């Protein structure tokens, strides 16, 4: 029988967690109730399968008793212990948790530690806001609790029941990855580089399972997480735009570890300058005041783009070059001299040959070329079909060197 782990703090959410447990059990799953309470006054309940002390013993560095009296430190410590506990369990067919901001922060890292495809549901009071810090590059399903997770009432019973039946359905009707003997290639795409990525995908799909990631910060993280996990045989990183948001302050930033997976794995890597002409913000009224006088373009009512200027382009090119210098596997980086996005072309709002020239020069002077690490300028626009052909050709060359 499939096993679902129900995780939360039984000292404050006991009735809700037991309600989840009972509904999931009634749906046909076995349940393991894991208590991660951190209150020093909490007493163990006999109907809990895994007590807090058992989870805490999984922490790699046992903390002193006085440290656990600080709630912030205790939550962080229990969260780390829970990660190690869940990793040690071979029978997690699915996991569900419920909590407020503290419980969400405690439980989410353990969910992120599980492989993609293992069902994960988190009922949370903070699920209607920015959930990126909790979900990260994984497939956690977050459900807004509507009312606080504080007792059972006419609202919480319905929300929790929906969550319980959701996780049960995911586990009992789980569909494994479709049988596909093709190796997987990761690609990064933004709306303004879509023609390029679609052309590359068409050229590769007969021989490769093409996994396309939207370059929205977490998209790049997912791309690299799969590379680190051994699920990709290489990458075509067309859209490195997340670097702009990271360095300038946009809403779709990469992490400082961008390109790190390819440095660690030495997988074949082909990259380009896709959408390095822009920084992303929300609706126009959310653009920070210091950028209001810059060249802005309304992409849609919820997304405003800002053109990167020469100074920013210099920093962006240098940062990418330095990160790629850490890669010792086959690296090809192609510069499309006639424009890096659909709106970086003659007559388009972000056409700026001067800024592009600064970007390209920064890449050239920073990237240290070797037999395996190469950079090339190409007199084409990034969305020109010939540029897509060159990306495919370079990937094939990188594979021959791998």
Swiss-Prot record:
Pfam families: UPF0261 (PF06792), UPF0261_C (PF23189). Gene3D superfamilies: Uncharacterised protein family UPF0261, NC domain, Uncharacterised protein family UPF0261, NN domain. It comes from Mesorhizobium japonicum (strain LMG 29417 / CECT 9101 / MAFF 303099) (Mesorhizobium loti (strain MAFF 303099)). The lineage of its organism: Bacteria, Pseudomonadati, Pseudomonadota, Alphaproteobacteria, Hyphomicrobiales. Belongs to the UPF0261 family. This is UPF0261 protein mll9388. Keywords: Plasmid.
């Amino acid at each position: 029988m499939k096993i679902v782990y129900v995780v939360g703090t039984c000292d404050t959410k006991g009735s809700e967690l037991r309600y989840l447990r009972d509904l999931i059990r009634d749906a046909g799953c076995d349940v393991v109730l894991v208590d991660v309470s951190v209150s020093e006054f909490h007493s163990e309940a006999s109907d809990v399968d895994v007590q807090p002390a058992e989870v805490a013993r999984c922490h790699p560095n046992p903390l002193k008793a006085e440290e656990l009296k600080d709630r912030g430190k205790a939550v962080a410590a229990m969260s780390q212990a829970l990660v190690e506990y869940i990793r040690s369990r071979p029978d997690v067919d699915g996991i569900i948790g419920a909590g407020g901001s503290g419980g969400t922060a405690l439980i989410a890292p353990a969910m992120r530690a599980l492989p993609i495809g293992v069902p994960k549901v988190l009922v949370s009071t903070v699920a209607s806001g920015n959930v990126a810090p909790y979900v990260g590059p994984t497939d956690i399903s977050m459900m807004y609790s509507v009312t606080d997770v504080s007792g059972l009432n006419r609202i919480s019973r319905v929300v929790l029941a929906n969550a319980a039946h959701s996780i049960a359905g995911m586990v009992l009707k789980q569909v494994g990855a479709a049988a596909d003997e093709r190796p997987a290639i990761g690609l990064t795409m933004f709306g303004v580089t879509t023609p390029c990525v679609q052309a590359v995908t068409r050229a590769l799909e007969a021989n490769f399972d093409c996994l396309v990631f939207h370059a929205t910060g977490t998209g790049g993280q997912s791309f690299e997480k799969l590379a680190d996990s051994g699920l990709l045989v290489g990458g075509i990183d067309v859209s490195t735009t997340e670097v702009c948001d990271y360095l300038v302050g946009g809403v779709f930033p990469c992490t400082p570890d961008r390109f790190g997976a390819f440095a660690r794995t030495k997988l074949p890597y082909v990259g380009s300058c896709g959408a390095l002409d822009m920084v992303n913000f929300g609706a126009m009224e959310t653009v920070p005041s210091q950028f209001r006088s810059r060249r802005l373009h309304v992409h849609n009512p919820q997304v405003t783009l800002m053109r990167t200027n020469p100074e920013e382009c210099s920093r962006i090119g240098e940062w990418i070059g330095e990160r790629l210098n850490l890669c010792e596997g086959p690296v090809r980086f192609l510069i499309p001299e006639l424009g890096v996005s659909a709106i970086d072309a003659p007559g388009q709002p972000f056409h700026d040959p001067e800024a592009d020239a600064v970007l390209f020069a920064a890449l050239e002077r920073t990237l240290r070329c070797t037999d395996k690490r190469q950079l090339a300028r190409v007199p084409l626009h990034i969305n020109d079909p010939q540029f897509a052909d060159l990306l495919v050709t370079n990937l094939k060359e990188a594979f021959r060197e791998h």
